[in-house]
C-alpha cells in the first residue's frame, strides 16, 4: 500500500498502517507522485451504488472544502500541505477552472486595432485628433474617420495557458466528477511547460491581469496563478496535489451552523472565570449553533462522531454536562422562550435528511431534561453547504424534533 500511495502521505502523518490496514487521518483529496487519486469522505458517509451519485458527492466535497478554504482561510493547523511536495490550491483551482470553462469556454483575448474610413464603431477622439475636417458654411464635417476594430488573438499566450491548464484540470478531476475531456481542448495538450518556466508564466499572467477589468477575467487569472503555484513547488519526479483538512470537525460545525443557525450566542452566554488574588481571567462557553423558532430555543452541538452499532464511542460525560449546562445558563437569558431543546447532530447516511437517533439523560436527575441525538445525511449536507442552499433546513429540523420526541 505504501508503494501505491507514495511515502509523503505517511511522512506527513496523514495516514498510517495498522494491522495491514491503512487508516487515513484527513478528509479530502490527495494525488500522489504515483498518480493515485485518493478521496476520503467524512465520517458517517457510505459509498452509494450509483457512480453518478458518487461523482456528484466528490464534486460537492471539493466545493465544500473550497468554500471552507475561502471563508476560513484554512487555519494552518487544519490545512494539509505536503511541505515542498505539493499544495492544496491546485485541486481547488482546477475544479473552479472546469466549472468556468463549462460556462464560458476558452479565454480569447480580443485586441483593438484602428482603421480608416469605416463607419462602424467610430472613435471620435482619435478622428478629431488625426483627421482633417472639412469646413463648409461654418459647419465642421469629417469625410474620413478612425474606427475601432476588434480582432481575436487566438495565438495569445494567455489563451494557450488557459487551454493547457483546463485540459490538465479535466485530466486530473474529470474521471472522478463524471466529466470527459472536451474535444476542443485536445489542441492544448502540447507541453507548454517545456517552452516556458512556470515562474515566467505566472509573471506573464500577473502582467496580463493588470490589463483586465471584468470580475471574470481577473478571477480567471487568479485561479490560473493558484493552479501553477500549487505545482511550482512540486519536485521534478512528483505530481502531488491535495485539498484536505486534518480535523473535519471544524468543517462539520460550519456546515451545521450554515444549515440551522439563526441567532448568535454572543453576549448571551455567561463566561466562567478564574479569580486569583486581584486578577480575573474569563473563559468562554458558546454553543456551536442556536436556532430560535417562535417561543422555542434549540441549542445544537455539531458532533463529528462515528455512530457504531454497539453504541461505543458516543459523547461522554464532558460533552453531556457541557450541553446540559448550556441549557441551564440560557433559561432566563433569552426573552419569550417557553421551550428549550438540547440537540446533538451527528454525520450519517439515510434516506431521510434528518433522522432521530436517540436521547441522553442523567440518571435520577430528570430536571436536566434530555439531549436528543439526530443524524444529518452527509451527502445532502455537503451538497447544500457547497451550493449555499440551506433548503429550509431550520424548518425541517424543528419538524423532525417535534415529531420524534
Predicted stretch roles:
Residues 1-18, 30-34, 235-405:
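Catalytic core segments in nucleotide and nucleic-acid processing enzymes
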Residues 1-205, 213-237, 399-405:
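Terminal, charged accessory segments of proteins
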Residues 211-214, 316:
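Ser/Thr-centered flexible coil motifs
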Amino acid at each position: 500500500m505504501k508503494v501505491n500511495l507514495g511515502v509523503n502521505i505517511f511522512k506527513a502523518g496523514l495516514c498510517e498502517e495498522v494491522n495491514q490496514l491503512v487508516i487515513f487521518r484527513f478528509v479530502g483529496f490527495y494525488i500522489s507522485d504515483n498518480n493515485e487519486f485518493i478521496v476520503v469522505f467524512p465520517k458517517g458517509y457510505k459509498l452509494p451504488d450509483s457512480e453518478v451519485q458518487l461523482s456528484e458527492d466528490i464534486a460537492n466535497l471539493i466545493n465544500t472544502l473550497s468554500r471552507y478554504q475561502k471563508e476560513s482561510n484554512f487555519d494552518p493547523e487544519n490545512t494539509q500541505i505536503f511541505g515542498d511536495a505539493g499544495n492544496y490550491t491546485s485541486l481547488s483551482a482546477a475544479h473552479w477552472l472546469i466549472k468556468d470553462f463549462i460556462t464560458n469556454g476558452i479565454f480569447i483575448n480580443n485586441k483593438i486595432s484602428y482603421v480608416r474610413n469605416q463607419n462602424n464603431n467610430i472613435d471620435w477622439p482619435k478622428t478629431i485628433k488625426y483627421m482633417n475636417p472639412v469646413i463648409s458654411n461654418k459647419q465642421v464635417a469629417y469625410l474620413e474617420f478612425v474606427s475601432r476594430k476588434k480582432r481575436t488573438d487566438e495565438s495569445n499566450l494567455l489563451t494557450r495557458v488557459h487551454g493547457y491548464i483546463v485540459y490538465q484540470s479535466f485530466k486530473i478531476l474529470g474521471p472522478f466528477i463524471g466529466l470527459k475531456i472536451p474535444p476542443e481542448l485536445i489542441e492544448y495538450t502540447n507541453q507548454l511547460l517545456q517552452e516556458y518556466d512556470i515562474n515566467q508564466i505566472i509573471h506573464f499572467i500577473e502582467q496580463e491581469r493588470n490589463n483586465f477589468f471584468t470580475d471574470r477575467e481577473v478571477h480567471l487569472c487568479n485561479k490560473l496563478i493558484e493552479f501553477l503555484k500549487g505545482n511550482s513547488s512540486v519536485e521534478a519526479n512528483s505530481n502531488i496535489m491535495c485539498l484536505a483538512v486534518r480535523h473535519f470537525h471544524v468543517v462539520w460545525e460550519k456546515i451545521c451552523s450554515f444549515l440551522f443557525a439563526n441567532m448568535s450566542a454572543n453576549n448571551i452566554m455567561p463566561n466562567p472565570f478564574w479569580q486569583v488574588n486581584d486578577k480575573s481571567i474569563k473563559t468562554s462557553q458558546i454553543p456551536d449553533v442556536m436556532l430560535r423558532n417562535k417561543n422555542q430555543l434549540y441549542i445544537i452541538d455539531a458532533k463529528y462522531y462515528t455512530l457504531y452499532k454497539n453504541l461505543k464511542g458516543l459523547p461522554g460525560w464532558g460533552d453531556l454536562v457541557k450541553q446540559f449546562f448550556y441549557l441551564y445558563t440560557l433559561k432566563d437569558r433569552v426573552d419569550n422562550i417557553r421551550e428549550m431543546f438540547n440537540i446533538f447532530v451527528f454525520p450519517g447516511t439515510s434516506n431521510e435528511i434528518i433522522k432521530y437517533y436517540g436521547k441522553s439523560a442523567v440518571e435520577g436527575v430528570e430536571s436536566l431534561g434530555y439531549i436528543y441525538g439526530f443524524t444529518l445525511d452527509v451527502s445532502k449536507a455537503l451538497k447544500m453547504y457547497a451550493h449555499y442552499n440551506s433548503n429550509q433546513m431550520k424548518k425541517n429540523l424543528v419538524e423532525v424534533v417535534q415529531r420524534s420526541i
